Amino acid sequence: RGLNPYVKDVARRLAKAGFIAFAPDALHPLGGYPGNDDEGRAMQHTLDRTKIQNDFVAAAHFLKAQPNSNGKLGAVGFCFGGYIVNYLASVESNLLTAGVPFYGTPASESLHKNIKAPLMIQLGELDKEYKRELKKLKV
C-alpha cells in the first residue's frame, strides 16, 4: 500500500529507540503513497513484484553495510511488507537476523529451507487462510 503514515510512525519509533530505521515506499516508481491505502493497494498490483523484491534485498544489503550498522538486520512488515519480511528471511539464509511479519504470505515454498532467522509471525487466531499458509512452513 506504500509508505503510509502508520509505517512512517513505526520507523520513527524504531529510530527513536536507537535503531537504523528504513521505511521504503514500494510505490515510489508510481509517484509514491497516494494518501489512502485503498488507492495504494490498487497501485501496488500494477508493479513488478520481482523488481520490488530485488529492491528490498538491495536495501537490506545496503543497510547492513552502513558504517554505523552492527551487521544485524531486523525487519518488520505489514501486509505486503509482511511478505517482504518473509521473503528476506528466505531468499538468503544470512540476510535477516530476525523478522516480525504482520500478516503477509510466506515466500515461495522452494525457499523455505533457507530460513534461519527467527520469525515472530503475527496473525489472527481465527484467520483460516493464513493458518493454511503457515502449515506449509511447519509452524
Model-derived features with residue positions:
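Short beta-strand/loop motif that positions the catalytic acidic residue
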Residues: 115, 121-123
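Conserved alpha/beta-hydrolase "acid-adjacent" motif
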Residues: 128-134
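Primarily recognizes the serine-hydrolase "nucleophile elbow" in alpha/beta-hydrolase
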Residues: 57-116
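Structural detector of well-ordered beta-strand residues that form the stable sheet scaffold
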Residues: 22, 99-100, 120
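Serine-hydrolase catalytic machinery in alpha/beta-hydrolase-like enzymes
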Residues: 1-65
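C-terminal catalytic histidine-bearing segment of alpha/beta-hydrolase fold enzymes
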Residues: 139
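Glycine-rich His-Gly loop
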Residues: 1-2, 79, 104, 124-125
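Short N-terminal helix/helix-N-cap motif within the alpha/beta-hydrolase-1
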Residues: 4-8, 31, 83, 110, ...
